[in-house]
C-alpha cells in the first residue's frame, strides 16, 4: 500500500481539488397507478415495456441539459430539471401493495448550496412540485 509520501504532491493536490458533491436530487414516490404517457398511452393497468426501463425526461435536446447545468452552477435548481424515472414495481410488484407502484426520480441539477436560501422543507416541497409538474406535461 502506498503512503501519501509515495504520491507526487501535484497529483495529491489535483485529487483534493475534485468536487465530489452530487448534482442529483432523488425523490421517491408512492403511486396509486402507473404513469400514463401521452406519447405511448396505457392500454391496460399492467406495466408496458416502456414502464420497465429508465424513462428520461427533459433531455430531448442537449441545450436542455446545458441550461439545467447552468442554473445549478448559479446556485439555483434547474427550471426544467432532467429527470430519470424508474418504476421498479413494473418488474417486481411485491415492492408495493396490489395496484400501487413505486417511482424513483433522479433529478438534475440541484446544487448542494442554494444562492438564495437553504434546502428547508418549503424549498424541498417547491422543488418536488416543479419536478411533478414537469412530469405531468
For each feature predicted by the language model, list its residue ranges.
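FAD-dependent oxidoreductase catalytic-site/capping-region signature
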Residues: 76, 81-137
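Mid-domain catalytic core of redox enzymes
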Residues: 1-96
Amino acid at each position: 500500500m502506498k503512503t501519501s509520501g509515495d504520491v507526487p504532491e501535484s497529483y495529491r493536490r489535483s485529487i483534493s481539488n475534485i468536487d465530489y458533491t452530487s448534482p442529483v436530487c432523488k425523490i421517491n414516490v408512492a403511486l396509486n397507478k402507473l404513469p400514463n404517457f401521452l406519447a405511448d398511452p396505457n392500454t391496460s393497468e399492467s406495466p408496458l415495456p416502456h414502464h420497465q426501463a429508465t424513462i428520461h425526461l427533459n433531455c430531448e435536446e442537449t441545450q436542455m441539459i446545458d441550461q439545467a447545468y447552468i442554473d445549478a452552477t448559479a446556485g439555483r435548481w434547474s427550471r426544467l430539471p432532467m429527470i430519470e424515472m424508474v418504476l421498479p414495481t413494473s418488474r417486481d410488484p411485491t415492492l408495493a401493495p396490489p395496484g400501487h407502484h413505486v417511482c424513483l426520480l433522479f433529478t438534475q441539477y440541484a446544487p448542494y448550496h442554494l444562492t438564495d436560501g437553504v434546502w428547508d422543507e418549503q424549498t424541498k416541497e417547491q422543488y418536488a412540485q416543479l419536478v411533478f409538474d414537469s412530469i405531468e406535461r
